[in-house]
A protein has these predicted regions:
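Penicillin-recognizing serine hydrolase domain
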Residues: 1-134
């Protein structure tokens, strides 16, 4: 409640809509929002821009690089954000490879099983291989 009183959801919705989201109405109250792959990419682009241009960018990057969830894998450092709630198991990352790239993997899985983790890892390693970074 304290954070929401200082940073109301309406302000967040307006800020996020400036990213060029396909479905800004899905932001709801700033939590447990719906997300499509294109909008995940828009968020990653905004995060990347913030990291590169804002004085607090290095702090955000360091925080996102400390995330240790085992979903997206890479041989390179990553700034990542995962999401997990009923009916949604997602991970997205900025991969700092020689040819940097952004990757978002969204699923309707909600349990985080070994099979789910394997799926995320296989997809992310295929992307790394085909991105010309291996």
């Amino acid at each position: 409640a304290l954070i929401r009183s200082a940073f109301p959801a309406d302000g967040y919705r307006a800020y996020a809509a400036s990213f060029g989201l396909t479905y800004p109405e899905d932001i709801r109250n700033g939590a447990n929002s719906l997300l499509c792959a294109r909008d995940a990419g828009a968020y990653l682009a905004a995060i990347d821009r913030f990291i590169r241009t804002n004085p607090y960018g290095p702090e955000l990057k360091a925080s996102l690089q400390r995330t240790k969830n085992p979903m997206i894998r890479s041989s390179y450092p990553m700034a990542r954000k995962y999401g997990w709630m009923e009916g949604a198991y997602h991970d997205m990352a900025i991969v700092y490879a020689p040819h940097p790239y952004r990757l978002a993997i969204l699923s309707n899985h909600d349990e985080g099983t070994k099979e789910d983790l394997r799926m995320f890892q296989e997809i992310s390693m295929l992307i790394e291989r085909y991105s010309g970074n291996t």
